[in-house]
């Protein structure tokens, strides 16, 4: 009986040690996920999520003598009125005491701190694709490593004269 228990205990120990060995060579990964599902009646979403999720390079190009531009598209819809947009702060790139002012065009309209219509009632009633362009103002730029943020706000504005 003692031999049976000893053999069984030895086999159990062997099985457990091989499990531990297997676990020591295990790899685990976590992937962060996010999702946004807009309402069917109002949305303003980039066609390429990298536009808003990754840094956009506006570096100076010696071959052209200009800063790179940021270009992209947004799908826009408001089935009950127009879409207005504004900037949350003055758009600029900053490097220490130096700054480069930026121009932000959405649907070919320059955005400011004051909300303005960027997509009309008839265009926004169906999925409308609006271009975005961010460019540097001026032609002379001081050397440096610049960073900045362009923060835009989009509002669903009810139709003039009531609902549809």
Residue ranges and their predicted role:
Residues 81, 109-110:
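Short acidic/polar mixed-charge low-complexity motifs
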Residues 22-94, 124-164:
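N-terminal small/polar-rich segments of proteins
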């Amino acid at each position: 009986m003692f031999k049976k228990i000893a053999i069984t205990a030895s086999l159990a120990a062997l099985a457990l040690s091989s499990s531990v060995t297997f676990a020591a060579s295990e790899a685990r990964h976590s992937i962060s996920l996010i999702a946004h599902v807009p309402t069917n009646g109002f949305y303003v979403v980039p066609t390429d999520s990298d536009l808003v999720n990754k840094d956009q390079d506006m570096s100076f190009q010696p071959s052209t003598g200009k800063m790179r531009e940021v270009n992209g598209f947004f799908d826009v819809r408001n089935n009950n009125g127009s879409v207005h947009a504004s900037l949350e702060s003055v758009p600029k790139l900053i490097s220490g005491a130096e700054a480069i002012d930026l121009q932000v065009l959405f649907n070919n309209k320059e955005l400011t701190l004051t909300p303005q219509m960027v997509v009309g009632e008839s265009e926004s009633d169906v999925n409308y694709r609006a271009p975005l362009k961010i460019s540097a103002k001026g032609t002379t730029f001081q050397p440096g490593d610049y960073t900045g943020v362009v923060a835009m706000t989009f509002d669903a504005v009810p139709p003039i004269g009531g609902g549809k």
